[in-house]
A protein has these predicted regions:
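Active-site loop segments of alpha/beta catalytic cores
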Residues: 1-63, 82, 90
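Catalytic-face loop-and-helix region of soluble metabolic enzyme cores
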Residues: 46-156
Length: 156
């Protein structure tokens, strides 16, 4: 057990973000589970990547943090494509519909759904290194197809 405060984590993230930004880059982070999403935003992260397939509802618990992220040009990277055998049960349409439900939940907290869509990146829920080549290829194909489908729905 390590006792680390929220302020400690935010300070460390801000230090890293400042270094990344000083080089002209953006800082992104991935969380495989649930977390207090505002810590990442308060820490200066530009791209918050999360497992939206299993934990997508949790981001709606932090609408103020998402507003802050969007206001400074940041993005949510929605890991809506499962990086597990569940990918065999999904299609681009089912995953786009899943994203729509999650975006609707976030929009119900007062965010503009069009802005949510504009500042979204579609990703896998986690890495694919432990999966078969076939499942990995399916995952990356579904990322592209789901993204294209949502771009078409939103006109960009």
């Amino acid at each position: 057990y390590v006792s680390v405060t929220r302020d400690d984590v935010v300070a460390i993230l801000n230090e890293m973000a400042e270094a990344v930004h000083a080089e002209g880059a953006v800082m992104g982070t991935h969380c495989c589970g649930n977390t207090e999403w505002s810590i990442l935003v308060d820490g200066g992260v530009d791209i918050v990547n999360f497992d939206a397939y299993e934990y997508g509802e949790t981001i709606a618990m932090y609408p103020d943090a998402v507003r802050t992220l969007f206001a400074r040009g940041g993005c949510l990277a929605w890991g809506v494509v499962p990086s597990s055998a569940k990918v065999r049960e999904e299609s681009a349409a089912s995953l786009a519909d899943r994203w729509e439900r999650l975006a609707d939940l976030l929009a119900s907290k007062g965010l503009d759904k069009a802005e949510i869509a504009r500042q979204a990146i579609i990703t896998s829920s986690c890495g694919t290194g432990s999966l078969s080549v076939e499942d990995s290829e399916r995952i990356f194909g579904l990322i592209a197809e789901t993204s294209a489908l949502l771009k078409k729905r939103y006109g960009f």
